[in-house]
Amino acid sequence: MKIPVLDKGFVELVDVMGNDLSAVRAARVSFNMELKDEEKDRRLVEYLMRHGHESPFEHIVFTFHVKAPIFVARQWFRHRIASYNELSGRYSKLTYEFYIPPLQRFGQTRIVPEKVIEKISHVVNESYQTYMELLEAGVPREVARIVLPLNLYTRFYWTVNARSLMNFLNLRADSHAQWEIQQYAVAIAKIFREKCPWTYEAFIKYAYKGDLLREV
């Protein structure tokens, strides 16, 4: 499952271990019990979420492949209870792929948005040209990359359990977060909802503190 985000980015589900019933099994083992009928299992998911018993949800694990601007990735990596592996600018030549914001991102600027985009594009072109010139001159990749701006796209793998994923959604699928990472959070939420519908529904009903997912 792959969802386009921003102008050139995406969120792709690579792997998932477990589902709603994984949390149910983990919770019932405390009482030496197994799965019951579907309605009781679903009510247990709601009970766990409503009362803040979140550890059973750690037994549901997702791995995502994400392509995002560097400045988005740096915000993302602040969510530490997860595992990350990122494209290396030391070992790979970085591709000419930069995020250019849509016109509505510029608000009440003193110059017209089209001129802002023109200035951003000019800096991007100049920096990448300099990067390539440095590489051609024999400068190591790890040094040449320092001239590239934060809107360069990077790619990374993110492995995260459902409990930590819900924390990510609480903080990033919210209007207080930067708009760009909001778009990624909404994409993550759509995948989460598809793979764990009971958990997602209970999360939105009892534990979600943001303001973007009520209509997703």
Curated annotation (Swiss-Prot):
Protein's pathway: Pyrimidine metabolism; dTTP biosynthesis
Output this protein's name: Flavin-dependent thymidylate synthase
PROSITE patterns, from UniProt? THYX
Q: Which family does it belong to?
A: Belongs to the thymidylate synthase ThyX family.
Q: Give the InterPro entries listed for this entry.
A: Thymidylate_synthase_ThyX (IPR003669), Thymidylate_synthase_ThyX_sf (IPR036098)
Which top EC class is named for this enzyme in its record? transferase
Instruction: Report the source organism.
Output: Thermotoga neapolitana (strain ATCC 49049 / DSM 4359 / NBRC 107923 / NS-E)
Recall the taxonomic lineage recorded for the source organism.
Answer: Bacteria, Thermotogati, Thermotogota, Thermotogae, Thermotogales
* Residue span of motif ThyX motif: 78-88
- Transmembrane in keyword set: no
Which residue positions are annotated as catalytic? 172
